[in-house]
């Protein structure tokens, strides 16, 4: 269900609809097409228990009141109940419609034509304060329709949060801003604590998995630039497994990430959000995820969060505090 002009309307996955702001978007990001593969039963270790706790309902109420989107909802994150029940959430800036169409992602796609909520930076900051967060992750849709890709909006939000309480740790999980250094500088020049950008998959699968405007080395060079300009800012990336990659390719991706100074890496199982998206090629066992973590730490990452249900921002506060990462 989508809420349009205050009315809940059923929009089928893959269908086109008109947003409240007057531009068109595609529900779940991928147009209707034949199923990619026969449905594969999920193993028992991927089953999630629902937890509608008081904290979960509190976070949901605050984000709705302040007209904020969360990647937890828009990307159908399997950890939404756990994270929200612990009073944490990942706020998605600049709306819920992305200008790109990655084949694994269920976020709606379209062209927002420059629309931005100018009140969002302060609304986000006030929400963080009301939730009582010590650590917040800010992420966003890609906004190629904006001159700076939305970097200035990100910076304004980080600054608003830090102005309310400079002790709140802020992680910015950003788009690539087309790899333009002047845009990246807008984020670096705030008091941000962690800058993350997801490489998503191994180099061989980048084109079939990600939007053509994204790039394997574009992501790595983005994070390399961040580390060179601001060595004290932690850098982070994330890989999904189960898209057809090999373990050897995963380890090579780890090597490439370490070669540009990335500090933290997360690995989790890809799960097909709708029948129109890429199918799951394999389910990786919890034991193999433990092996990924062991290898990653041996390669020099300060922290490796690896598990079937791990996502890039999963309990990011906890990951940040491990191994003396707290700033």
UniProtKB/Swiss-Prot annotation:
What residues does [4Fe-4S] cluster 2 bind to? Answer: 98, 102, 105
Say where the protein is mainly found.
cytoplasm
Q: Where in the cell is it found?
A: Cytoplasm
Residues given in the record as [4Fe-4S] cluster 1 binding sites? 72, 77, 83, 313
User: In this record, what's one Pfam family?
Assistant: Radical_SAM
Which pathway does the record list? Protein modification; protein lipoylation via endogenous pathway; protein N(6)-(lipoyl)lysine from octanoyl-[acyl-carrier-protein]: step 2/2
**One function term, GO molecular function aspect:** 4 iron, 4 sulfur cluster binding
The cofactor(s) it depends on are: [4Fe-4S] cluster
Manner of cofactor binding, per the entry note = Binds 2 [4Fe-4S] clusters per subunit. One cluster is coordinated with 3 cysteines and an exchangeable S-adenosyl-L-methionine.
Q: Which SUPFAM superfamilies match?
A: Radical SAM enzymes (SSF102114)
List the catalytic activities from the record: [[Fe-S] cluster scaffold protein carrying a second [4Fe-4S](2+) cluster] + N(6)-octanoyl-L-lysyl-[protein] + 2 oxidized [2Fe-2S]-[ferredoxin] + 2 S-adenosyl-L-methionine + 4 H(+) = [[Fe-S] cluster scaffold protein] + N(6)-[(R)-dihydrolipoyl]-L-lysyl-[protein] + 4 Fe(3+) + 2 hydrogen sulfide + 2 5'-deoxyadenosine + 2 L-methionine + 2 reduced [2Fe-2S]-[ferredoxin]
Q: What class of enzyme is it?
A: transferase
According to the UniProt entry, what is the EC number of this protein?
2.8.1.8
* InterPro entries named among the record's database cross-references: Aldolase_TIM, Elp3/MiaA/NifB-like_rSAM, LIAS_N, Lipoyl_synth, rSAM
Record keywords: 4Fe-4S, Cytoplasm, Iron, Iron-sulfur, Metal-binding, S-adenosyl-L-methionine, Transferase
Transmembrane intervals? none
Per the database record, which ranges form the Radical SAM core domain? 83-302
Q: Name one GO cellular component term.
A: cytoplasm
Q: Which PANTHER family match?
A: LIPOYL SYNTHASE (PTHR10949), LIPOYL SYNTHASE, MITOCHONDRIAL (PTHR10949:SF0)
Q: Which NCBIfam families does this UniProt record tie to the protein?
A: lipA, PRK05481.1, PRK12928.1
- HAMAP family in UniProt: Lipoyl_synth
**Entry's family note:** Belongs to the radical SAM superfamily. Lipoyl synthase family.
- What name has this protein been given in UniProt? Lipoyl synthase
Give the source species.
Francisella tularensis subsp. mediasiatica (strain FSC147)
């Amino acid at each position: 269900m989508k809420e349009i002009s205050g009315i809940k309307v059923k929009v089928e996955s893959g269908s086109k609809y008109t947003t409240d702001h007057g531009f068109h978007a595609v529900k779940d990001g991928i147009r209707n097409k034949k199923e990619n593969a026969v449905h594969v039963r999920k193993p028992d270790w991927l089953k999630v228990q629902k937890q509608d706790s008081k904290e979960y309902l509190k976070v949901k109420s605050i984000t709705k009141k302040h007209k904020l989107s969360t990647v937890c909802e828009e990307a159908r994150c399997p950890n939404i109940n756990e994270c929200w029940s612990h009073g944490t959430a990942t706020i998605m800036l600049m709306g819920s419609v992305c200008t790109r169409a990655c084949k694994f992602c269920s976020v709606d796609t379209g062209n927002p034509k420059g629309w931005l909520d100018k009140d969002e930076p302060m609304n986000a900051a006030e929400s963080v304060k009301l939730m009582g967060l010590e650590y917040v992750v800010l992420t966003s849709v890609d906004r190629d329709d904006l001159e700076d890709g939305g970097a200035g909006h990100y910076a304004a939000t980080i600054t608003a949060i830090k102005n309310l309480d400079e002790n709140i740790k802020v992680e910015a999980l950003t788009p690539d801003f087309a790899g333009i250094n002047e845009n990246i500088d807008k984020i670096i020049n705030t008091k941000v604590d962690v800058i993350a950008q997801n490489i998503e998959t191994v180099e061989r699968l980048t084109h079939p998995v990600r939007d053509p405007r994204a790039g394997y080395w574009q992501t790595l060079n983005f994070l390399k630039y961040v580390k060179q300009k601001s060595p004290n800012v932690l850098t982070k990336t994330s890989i999904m497994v189960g898209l057809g990659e090999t373990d050897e390719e995963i380890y090579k991706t780890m090597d490439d990430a370490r070669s540009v100074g990335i500090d933290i890496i997360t690995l989790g199982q890809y799960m097909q959000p709708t029948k129109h998206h890429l199918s799951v090629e394999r389910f990786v066992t919890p034991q193999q995820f433990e092996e990924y973590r062991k290898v990653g730490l041996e390669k020099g990452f300060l922290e490796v969060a690896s598990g079937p249900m791990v996502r890039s921002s999963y309990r990011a506060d906890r990951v940040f505090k491990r191994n003396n990462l707290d700033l």
